Amino acid sequence: MQLRREIFDKARRVVVKVGSAILTNVGGIHTSFIADLAREISYLRQSGHEVILVSSGAVAAGRKKISWQDSAPLGMKEKQALAAIGQSHLMRTYEEAFGFYELDVAQILLTHADLSHRDRYLNIRNTILTLLKFGVTPIINENDTVSVEELKFGDNDTLAALLTNLLEADICICLTDVDALYDKNPQKDPTARPLHIVTKISPEIEAMAGNSNSLFGTGGMQSKIRAAKIVFSGGGTAIIGPGRAPRVLQRLFAGEDIGTIFLPCKERMKSKKQWIAHVLKPKGTLLLDAGACKALLQGGKSLLPSGIVGISGEFDRGDSVNCCRLDGSRIAVGLVNYASVDVNAIKGLQSREIASVLKCCDNEEVIHRDNLVILS
């Protein structure tokens, strides 16, 4: 309890994420939950903490608003339309709840493309920090009305984690309908025990979250583990908290042993490398020989064309690509200095041969080490 209390006492900026499962009920938006959430965030604000809220619920709210009865899986156009209906209803509920405590809120809707462009990524940071300076609580959601499947964040757990790193927040709290991370499936095994502290996200910890077909499903426990890894790389603390527990945020900040806390790593990844590793979606893959893998993993070197034995995918200069061993295992991700057609032409060659093949040589490296993130 003492360790938890110390972590929360030091926290200045906090990201809180709430999902559809606890935001909605059979009657639509769970207004009493939002009222309680506003009260708790007001308490944190009064205690000197800055709070950013990441809120799901637009599609679910829209579905309830127009009494959508079709039980079939929603298509993209239905999701987008329901999000458009539900988002305004959701924000109105937040405005009323926070207004009771004389707090202002601001809506921010993001797509993955907003974070993929470095300038827009930094502009989002500046906007949110300015809102906090104004004393306004940002309420952020994925813009489901315009997002397409291949450019989605995947879930708001990921969005919350990315924002935690972007804003250099100290803590990311994911409030969920599950009490904590368990060592076994608690709905199937009565001996399952909650893990209250995780010091390292090992393969064993990831296995405890199940797979995408488990009871947790997409946006469930597995996505929260992925989010915790992102927060971990940025030097922050991640929390999985029981969203339906009374006064959950106040109890967490009091150091109470509820939920699961993922302790931060000691070394924070640089901001640009966090962006490369977690925000950008790789457009292709480079297969590397053993020598190149060793140079990257042990020598901290840049990737030269001589170590590349194969490529896949189509990409342009400046795009993100995976760097893999010959067996396909990924060791790094980075920004390429050459388009795929040029990399294919110079793979296996010495850097001094680039100019004779491409008729120019802007860079000796295919990926400079400053734009390379080692993953294993």
UniProtKB/Swiss-Prot annotation:
NCBIfam families: proB. Its main location: cytoplasm. GO terms for biological process: L-proline biosynthetic process. Substrate binds at S56, D144, N156. Pathway: Amino-acid biosynthesis; L-proline biosynthesis; L-glutamate 5-semialdehyde from L-glutamate: step 1/2. InterPro entries: AceGlu_kinase-like_sf (IPR036393), Asp/Glu/Uridylate_kinase (IPR001048), G5K_ProB (IPR041739), Glu/AcGlu_kinase (IPR001057), Glu_5kinase (IPR011529), Glu_5kinase/COase_Synthase (IPR005715), Glutamate_5-kinase_CS (IPR019797), PUA (IPR002478). Catalyzes the transfer of a phosphate group to glutamate to form L-glutamate 5-phosphate. The keyword Cytoplasm applies. GO terms for cellular component: cytosol. This is Glutamate 5-kinase. Keywords: Amino-acid biosynthesis, ATP-binding, Cytoplasm, Kinase, Nucleotide-binding, Proline biosynthesis, Transferase. PROSITE patterns: GLUTAMATE_5_KINASE, PUA. It is found in: Cytoplasm. The gene is proB. The lineage of its organism: Bacteria, Pseudomonadati, Thermodesulfobacteriota, Desulfobulbia, Desulfobulbales. The keyword Transit peptide does not apply. It catalyses: L-glutamate + ATP = L-glutamyl 5-phosphate + ADP.
